[in-house]
Swiss-Prot record:
Disulfide bond annotation, renumbered to this chain: none
GO molecular-function terms, A-Z: acid phosphatase activity; metal ion binding
Transmembrane segments: none
Name this polypeptide is given: Probable inactive purple acid phosphatase 1
Superkingdom assignment: Eukaryota
PANTHER family recorded: INACTIVE PURPLE ACID PHOSPHATASE 1-RELATED, PURPLE ACID PHOSPHATASE-RELATED
Length: 613
């Protein structure tokens, strides 16, 4: 037994010892563990014990584990690392993880916490305990005690194994709008490959007959990643991602569903039951409420993984969205989704965090730099922001109604809204495939039925006075407005919303950097320009504004928050900015217009005419 434990410990050291050789983006807490100075310090008087050993006995997919530990030489910088899979065997490491010299790497810790977190007297007593939340991630777990802090860790002891009763169970369903207005998609994750079970959804109108619909299955392998850490230290098997298409839905109706798998012996494994409300018919005159934000990320409710506080506010945003869920019809998370940055275990933790939201209302995404950017991968920008993911996890974990899911631009109709979602990680300039899509999306909407035309993108293509855009001198992505403002103006886009800059900012209705209205809160059409919003305060660390506040910048807030658009009817729209800390409205405006206002000419918004015409 002891020889086996020592072998595991030695291999854990190998795992950690290689992490320093691959640098991830500084935003990822796990990348802060500088373990290149690690030493082996197994101590017979030290121990780590975890209980219960079997989780999810009542069907739950997250559970608190009590971790008790003791060290004969305690220190304030001792910490507990959580590992999954629990065993670390160097013989299982893939070939492309060979290091110049031993040790070799298998996988990174899932999360960590300091040993004195719940016991300030840890250095006196040498004992402590933590309650750590684990989620079902398709494998078992173990817990390791380290001394020496994050910068000079010494492995002291490792625990028994802990596992969920059914690690393959279907978990974390997430809804998305389909390509047709009467279609809803449901995506979930499991450990069941097609060789083990067939994925199915049981669904129907609430209180009515239910039917079974099949689901497609996707996954991806390590060699689908573009670089480290996603391809090396951060790699973790994503399991299987299943998507079913629920079609011919009645408008504005409540449906119930559950996801599951039919095993080879005919037995069915089911999730718990969920419900959603289907979309209204395009143009249907009913109150419709949509939430929009970017750059949220994830955080641990047990306080772990806190090398920094970069995304702690994401829990506040999530909490407020859940609190207001009954008054929300759809959510758009416009890029920088979970900041996994190549540590793939974080994707499971993110979809678990948003499950109460995404299982109830459509959770639509846009592509951000932290999902897509990687050198020589076809992204519009160069950089290491995705940690080697190059878009693959995001494009697989979440369904979007795009023609090509590797090019995350698409249109979505919800009642009186038309959303045109751009992909700023691919070229959007005039003459490109995406530019043609954007124009088609804006031009093809019937504004008599869907008067509210909203443009969404991750990077700021319009206006922002965030310091890094001010330093560019463009107050936006270079080439952003240059290519697109004539489309916004021509097709009378009401509001354009972006993330990327981690703050909140609202402009006046603006065209070519000039305000086209001096009103600030109650707009009456025609606006003769587009209102631009930065909503990048979903939860990731905030970004400062420049000292200069341009004339077009009406409202700036250095805080976390999200937007809510309410289409009251075809003539009235309410815009609200709510803070994540309290859920209260801190900025708002209304737009009132009639169909004739959309038809009327404004500067550069009508076809050219001649004397002959």
């Amino acid at each position: 037994m002891r020889e086996s434990l020592v072998a595991i410990l030695v291999t854990v050291i190998s795992v950690l010892g290689a992490i320093h050789q691959v640098k991830s983006h500084e935003d990822q807490p796990l990348s802060g563990i500088a373990v290149h100075k690690i030493t082996f310090g197994l101590n017979e008087k030290a121990y780590v014990k975890a209980s219960p050993t079997v989780l999810g006995s009542n069907g739950q997919h997250s559970e608190l584990v009590l971790v008790q530990y003791s060290s004969p030489k305690p220190s304030d910088d001792d910490w507990i690392g959580v590992f999954s899979p629990a065993d670390f065997n160097a013989s299982t490491c893939p070939g492309d993880n060979k290091m110049v010299q031993p040790p070799r790497l298998c996988s990174a810790p899932v999360k960590f916490q300091y040993a004195n977190f719940s016991n300030p007297r840890y250095t006196n007593t040498g004992t402590g305990s933590l309650k750590l939340q684990l989620i079902n991630q398709r494998s078992d777990f173990s817990f390791a005690l380290f001394s020496g802090g994050l910068l000079n860790p010494k492995l002291v002891a490792i625990s028994n194994k802990v596992a969920f009763e059914n690690p393959n169970a279907p978990v974390y369903p997430r809804l998305a709008l389909g390509k047709e207005w009467d279609e809803m998609t449901v995506t979930w994750t499991s450990g069941y490959g097609l060789n083990l079970a067939e994925p199915v959804v049981e669904w129907g109108v609430k209180g009515g007959e239910r039917k079974l619909s099949p689901a497609g299955t996707l996954t991806f392998a390590r060699n689908s990643m573009c670089g480290a850490p996603a391809r090396t230290v951060g790699w973790r098997d994503p399991g299987y991602i299943h998507t079913a298409f629920l079609k011919e839905l009645w408008p504005n109706s409540k449906y119930t569903y559950r996801v599951g798998h039919r095993l080879s012996n005919g037995a069915l494994i089911w999730s718990k039951e969920y419900q959603f409300k289907s979309s209204p018919f395009p143009g249907q005159n009913s109150v419709q409420q949509v939430v929009i934000f970017g750059d949220m990320g994830k955080a641990e409710v047990d306080g772990s993984s806190e090398y920094n506080d970069f995304q702690r506010a994401s829990l506040n945003t999530t909490k407020q969205l859940i609190k207001d869920l009954k008054k929300t019809d759809a959510v758009f998370h416009i890029g920088d989704i979970c900041y996994a940055n190549g540590y793939l275990s974080q994707w499971d933790q993110f979809i678990a965090q948003i499950e109460p939201i995404a299982s109830t209302v459509p959770y639509m995404i846009a592509s951000g730099n932290h999902e897509r950017v990687w050198p020589n991968s076809g992204s519009f920008y160069e950089g290491l922001d995705s940690g080697g993911e190059c878009g693959v996890p995001a494009e697989t974990m979440f369904y979007v109604p795009a023609q090509n899911r590797a090019k995350v631009w698409y249109s979505s109709d919800y009642g009186m809204f038309r959303f045109c979602v751009a992909d700023t990680e691919h070229d959007w300039r005039e003459g490109t495939e995406q530019y043609n899509f954007i124009e088609h999306c804006l031009a093809s909407v019937d504004r008599q039925k869907q008067p509210w035309l909203i443009f969404l993108a991750h990077r700021v293509l319009g206006y922002s006075s965030t310091y890094f855009y001010a330093e560019e001198g463009s107050f936006a992505e270079p080439m952003g407005r240059e290519s697109l403002q004539k489309l916004w103006q021509k097709y009378k886009v009401d509001i354009a919303i972006y993330g990327h800059a981690h703050n909140y900012e609202r402009t006046c209705p603006v065209y070519q950097s000039v305000c086209t209205s001096h009103e600030k809160s109650n707009y009456k059409a025609p606006l003769n320009g587009t209102i631009h919003i930065v909503a990048g305060g979903g939860g990731a660390g905030l970004a400062e504004f420049s000292d200069l506040q341009p004339n077009w910048s009406l409202f700036r807030d250095y805080d976390y928050g999200f937007l809510k658009l309410t289409a009251i009817d075809h003539s009235n729209l309410l815009f609200e900015y709510k803070k994540s800390s309290d859920g209260r409205v801190h900025d708002s405006f209304t737009i009132s217009k009639d169909y004739r206002d959309i038809l009327a000419c404004a500067v550069d918004s009508c076809p050219a005419t001649t004397l002959a015409s």
